[in-house]
């Protein structure tokens, strides 16, 4: 059972959708993704994993856990906890240092810069819990050549490397858990969003050394 949709809260407007999701999960079908893997990709779960001591629950070796943490940027809740209220103040005070992310995938949903205060002051406290705050990653730009709509464009760009993972489990029994390739997305340096499907970025080819 492959989920082409179902990655946004709006995809589950009634209990019928939740019942259907749970029915697939309980069946003998292979769910892609499984409910656990689906949750692991949610922005809120990623934010929780960045909390002190959480990664260490899953990685016993302290040195390895520390190396994993070196890859993290700041991730903060936007709820009504003291940490969430502090993050809200940070975002309102210096919005250009952050990006606000909803529980959605596909590109085009993140909020940047001057739009952050507009969002945070327009949503309710309950709605704000559905977002997280992340430090804005400022990748070093470089010059490259893009082909868009059949036209050759020379531009200052930045790239984002994603690593595919293959994970198959049967309950708590992990059958396969390995790296399965990569995806390099490149976009103009002055563009905030980075989704290929949403038209913000192009698929690139890295030189692997």
Predicted regions mapped to residue ranges:
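Domain-scale recognition of functional cores that engage charged ligands
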Residues: 2-208
């Amino acid at each position: 059972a492959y989920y082409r949709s179902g990655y946004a809260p709006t995809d589950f407007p009634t209990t019928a959708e939740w019942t259907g999701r749970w029915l697939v999960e309980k069946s003998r079908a292979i769910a892609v993704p499984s409910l656990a893997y689906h949750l692991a990709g949610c922005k809120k779960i990623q934010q929780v994993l960045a909390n002190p001591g959480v990664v260490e629950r899953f990685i016993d070796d302290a040195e390895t856990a520390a190396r994993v943490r070196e890859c993290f940027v700041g991730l903060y809740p936007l709820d009504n906890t003291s940490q969430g209220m502090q993050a809200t103040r940070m975002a309102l005070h210096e919005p250009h240092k952050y990006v606000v992310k909803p529980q959605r995938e596909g590109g085009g949903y993140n909020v940047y810069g001057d739009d952050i205060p507009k969002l945070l002051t327009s949503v309710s406290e309950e709605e704000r819990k559905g977002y997280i705050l992340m430090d804005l990653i400022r990748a070093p730009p470089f010059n490259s050549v893009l082909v868009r709509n059949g036209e050759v464009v020379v531009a200052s760009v930045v790239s984002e490397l994603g690593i595919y993972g293959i994970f198959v489990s049967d309950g708590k029994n992990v059958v396969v858990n390995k790296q399965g390739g990569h995806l390099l997305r490149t976009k103009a340096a002055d563009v905030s969003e980075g989704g290929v499907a949403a038209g913000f970025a192009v698929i690139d080819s890295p030189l692997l050394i």
